[in-house]
Each structure stands twice: as structure tokens, then as C-alpha cells.
A protein has these predicted regions:
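Alpha-helical membrane segments of multi-pass proteins
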Residues: 1-324
Length: 324
């Protein structure tokens, strides 16, 4: 394993260095450890109370969420993020789409709710269902929260600042994860949400997000080279040229975003199907209850005695009446 300092004259990226290059990142390491300890500690507290917690959620939060965060913060992606446009594009894509999706699937807010006392839970419910929370989770708002940060990042001088200043880079990454989490939290609805909207709305929002990915990808592909002065000043003599490097990054943001969106769509469809089945069971129970109430309100009458077969025959029935 080779530890490489960010901003140094990096060696050429080879297949071996893809697997062995890494960089220390103490603030991110502390963040990952604290979040992991809080989440796993909460699960342990629930188990001491005799309450179970789904393993799938734990794997999503720790393995998928924190694991992907560590991947883009310590691995080759982080090492070459300030040198190669496509490496930074891959890093930002994971931060805005993959990491927050897995964090939301881990249901951290539900875990926190289970650990709160009854009064604290009631106060949290008031905040959750406040007008401000409902406004912030309105579908068009959360859509903008997801799609605007990448556009601002790449189509403004902010992108070059993230390359030159590690603090700005960290804050930008935090905003990407936060915006993505708000989106996935409100659309997946694994955790309680202020506005329980329809999953069909989520499907339409996803189409908008796909369109924005295409617009950003095409803009980077057909537009001028971003942060050209910075990249030229590095004096890199290996790897793709600046134009090709940016084209690769544009493809990652465009196609990669669509690929990451596939498991999200699969999860939405699965939850929509489960919700429909649950709703069908509720409707059947309500209809059965209504039928039972109506049956109790009907007057009790003696059932008519069944008629003999010859009483149904016109000629035989007439002869029987004459004899009587």
C-alpha cells in the first residue's frame, strides 16, 4: 500500500496504484468512526431493551453509506481527485447519490426515535410535522436540493476552489451528501417524513434528475475545459489530456448517475408494491367491518321453507291445489 499526500507530484496512475494508493484523511476518519459508533451503539442499546433491528439496515448504513464515504475519502479516488477531472467526478457522484442513498436506507432517524423517551419523541414529532419541515420536503424543493449543487459546483468558480482549498472541498462534499440524504430520506420514506407523498411522484422526480444529469454531462462534454489554468499548472505529463479527461468525467457523471439510479428505482418499486399490498389489506379489513355492521343491523327473519319439486311444476301444482 502506498500513502500519497494530496497536492504532491503524483506518479502516473497504473492498475497497481488503483488498488494500492491511499491517503490519510483524519477529519473524515473521525467522522466515519463517530457516525459508525453512534449507529452501532444505538443498535446495542435497542437490543438491551429486547428490541431487534433489521440487519439489512445496518449493512446499508455502515457498509454502503460509511463504506462508500471511506472509499472516496481514502482510496485512489481521493488521491487523484485533485489531479484528474474524472477522479473528482467519480468522487462527487458517489457523495451526492450513492453514499446518501445507503445512509437513508439505514433508517438512522427511526433508530434515533426508538432511543428517545416518550416526551422527547413527542417533541421530535412536532418538529417533523411542522410547516417548515413540510415546506422543505415538498417534492420540487427536494428535487432542487439534489440537482442544483452539482450544477453550481461545476458551472461556477467553486469547482476550482475545491481543488485549491481542502476546507472548501470538504464543505462542498458535506453539502453534496446532505442534499442527497434529504432527497433520499424524503423519497424512499424508510424513516418518518413530514410529507408522505406518492411513490409515483418519486418516479417522475427521478426522470427530472436523469434529465439534469444529461444536461450537466453534455455541458461538460461540449463546453470548455473547466479549471484549465489549475490543471495546466500541475504540469502533468501522463494520463489523458485535459479535454479527454473532462470528457471521461462527463460520462461518469451522466452514465454513472443513471446506473446508480437503477437500485434506487428498484427500491422505490419494491416499496410501492409493498405499500399497495398493505393498503389493499387495510381496505379489505374496512369492507369486512362495514359488512359485519350492516349484517347486525338487518332484521332477523325466518328463512322460507324450501318448496317441493312438484310445487314448482305448474300442472302438478294446480292438481294439488284442486285436491286440497
Amino acid at each position: 500500500m502506498h500513502a500519497l499526500a494530496l497536492g504532491s507530484d503524483l506518479p502516473a496512475l497504473t492498475p497497481a496504484r488503483v488498488l494500492t494508493s491511499w491517503t490519510p484523511n483524519p477529519p473524515l476518519l473521525l467522522t466515519v468512526l463517530v457516525l459508525g459508533a453512534l449507529y452501532l451503539g444505538g443498535i446495542s442499546a435497542l437490543r438491551r431493551r429486547g428490541t431487534s433491528w433489521p440487519r439489512a439496515r445496518t449493512w446499508c448504513f455502515v457498509g454502503g453509506g460509511l463504506g462508500s464515504l471511506a472509499l472516496v475519502g481514502f482510496s485512489m479516488v481521493a488521491v487523484y481527485a485533485d489531479t484528474l477531472f474524472w477522479a473528482r467526478a467519480l468522487q462527487n457522484l458517489i457523495l451526492v447519490m450513492l453514499t446518501p442513498m445507503f445512509l437513508a436506507l439505514g433508517a438512522p432517524l427511526s433508530l434515533l426515535r426508538e432511543l428517545l423517551s416518550a416526551p422527547a419523541r413527542a417533541r421530535a414529532a412536532v418538529v417533523l410535522h411542522s410547516r417548515l419541515a413540510r415546506a422543505l420536503t415538498f417534492p420540487p424543493v427536494v428535487t432542487l436540493v439534489l440537482v442544483i449543487p452539482p450544477l453550481v459546483l461545476y458551472l461556477s468558480p467553486l469547482y476550482e476552489q475545491t481543488l485549491r482549498d481542502q476546507l472548501v472541498s470538504g464543505l462542498a462534499g458535506f453539502c453534496l451528501v446532505l442534499g442527497g440524504f434529504v432527497y433520499y430520506w424524503s423519497r424512499l420514506r424508510v424513516d418518518p417524513v413530514p410529507r408522505p407523498g406518492s411513490y409515483l411522484v418519486t418516479m417522475w422526480i427521478t426522470l427530472v434528475e436523469v434529465l439534469v444529469d444529461a444536461i450537466l454531462g453534455l455541458t461538460l462534454w461540449l463546453g470548455p475545459v473547466i479549471a484549465a489554468a489549475y490543471y495546466l499548472g500541475m504540469g502533468r505529463h501522463w494520463g489523458p489530456d485535459l479535454r479527454t479527461d473532462q470528457d471521461i468525467g462527463a460520462g461518469i457523471l451522466w452514465i454513472g448517475g443513471d446506473i446508480i439510479g437503477l437500485p434506487f428505482l428498484a427500491t422505490v418499486i419494491a416499496r410501492m408494491t409493498k405499500e399497495d399490498e398493505h393498503r389493499a389489506v387495510e381496505i379489505d379489513a374496512e369492507l369486512d367491518a362495514i359488512d359485519a355492521i350492516e349484517a347486525e343491523q338487518l332484521p332477523v327473519t325466518d328463512a322460507a321453507a324450501p318448496r317441493l319439486w312438484w310445487e314448482e311444476h305448474p300442472e302438478l301444482a294446480a292438481r294439488t291445489r284442486r285436491k286440497n
